[in-house]
């Protein structure tokens, strides 16, 4: 196993450190839905970037499955174009030439038995030609309605069978159902064919460096964890804001909405990592156990009308351009009640967090694209300074910036230079891009590599998915019975009702 040395090596890394990077063993990846946007913009470039970093085995194989009437060479050209346009690392001909050796394409529809037999033959051929050892991951980059038929076809044609020390794995993209009942049905279908340790549910947020850094920040340092509790924390705000509209996703988005699309998975996972107890170790079972405890302890306020807000973007100005509202978007029903903004207040019934509200919000066409977790601390119980000295002093906060500008900011009060005592907020800032010269890998690079390695640390388990739906389902049911979403102009930070929700608690949203 050759040691791979990254170009632009990290100056903070000890040159005497002889730990090898984790490199996948003999294996291949089959992508269903290989002609879609996700495959072209994320999956294919991530595979190339892993190969470019020396983290894939020499005989790695990539198989595309779709309806297109393509030869292997046509598929290779599509991958080539996607890599050239979207890859994070520079294009190198020698890496490409090695990767192309293991590329194959299988033409067919999901209900085509002959196509799945051809897929089985292709995998057997690659085992001989590329030495993949029977180890294949099946990536279902397909609409949820197609999951059951693809899973059943894999079973019917013995593609899910693990023999002679080889492995087979299923990779599933969100949404994992649209409510608890459908999630349970989907899980039953998947687990009829694949055991739980063979199933990898992709939440790409968990592949981001800054999300993993939540655990490092909390548990590798002694200065944060002692104050990470109800005795010191006033409240927590978790925000995922987008400045774009729905684009061409009307067919997917309408009827799903912001809460199902983002809160059920991304934001509740961020809440779990922020609030969980320290795991016994950093292995998948220990992490999942602590996340499940937190999600199981989440409680909804009794009055959902006052503790939740949904909104829909109206026409407005975004980045200096006039943009249309959600109901004017192509393909959207003019009477649609789908939420493009959602804000909820949650509490966690355990000793660490009792009485501390967690405010989650997400939305499209907001002020800017940003994802952050803000842990906001209580004010000092006593201040020796007079009120004029501290009138501009806010609350201390630790803000974890997930995207963009990945990093951490600590906000605290400091004396303003001068003859009088005046205290204002200042910030201490850590930015990934400045402290580490190696650029962070894309989330899909990390996640695909983990699938090939069989490392399920960063993948939500069945229980986490179902617990998340148990939290969201009552909110969705309440919204279904009570009127329409509040309107908010594009380019703003959401409906005024969301500001009023926090104002009733004597708080206000952070302006990221």
Regions found by a protein language model. Give the residues of each.
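Secretory/organelle targeting and membrane-embedding segments
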Residues: 1-172, 176-512
